[in-house]
C-alpha cells in the first residue's frame, strides 16, 4: 500500500512538471525593447494633469494587478485611436510598484500592445497626492480624469467604451 502511494505521488509529480514545461514552451516571446515607460514622482506628473492646451486630456490611473483596470484598458485604447485626430490625448498612469516596471509593467504593455502614453507613478509611501487630483477620490482604482482648459471631471469607476465615449462627448461639445 505504501509503495503504491509513492508510485502515484511520483506519477503525479511527473505530470505537473510536464505541464509546466509545455506551458513554458507555449509562451510567446515579447519584444519589450521598444516600450518606453518613464517613472515620475507626483511633482513631475502634476504638469501632465494640468495642461492648458486646446486638447482634451484623458488620464487613467490603473495597475497590472487590478482586474477592472485591465478590463477597461481596451476602451481607452479605442478612444485614443478614434479621437486622436479630434485633439484627444490619452495618458495611462500605472500605479504598479516601480520595482515591477521591468518584470510586469513593460511586458504587460508589450503583450497588450498599448499605444497610449504610459507612465509609472512612484511617490514612495506618500499617498496624499491623490486628493490633489480630486478631493473626493478615495484612492481606489480604476480612476479617470478627463479635462480641458475649461472643465475637469473625475471618475472613480470602471468604463466600457460606450460610457467613456459618452463622458468625452461632454467635452467635445464645449
Give names to the regions the model predicted.
Residues 55-57, 61-65, 97:
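Short pre-active-site segment immediately N-terminal to redox-active cysteine/selenocysteine motifs
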Residues 61-78:
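Conserved redox-active cysteine motifs that mediate thiol-disulfide chemistry
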Residues 36-57, 80:
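A short beta-strand-turn-helix
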Residues 74-112, 125-131:
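Structural microenvironment flanking redox-active thiols in thiol-disulfide oxidoreductases
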Residues 108-141, 149:
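Short, internal strand/loop/helix patches
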Residues 141-174:
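Thiol-/selenol-based redox modules, centered on thioredoxin-like
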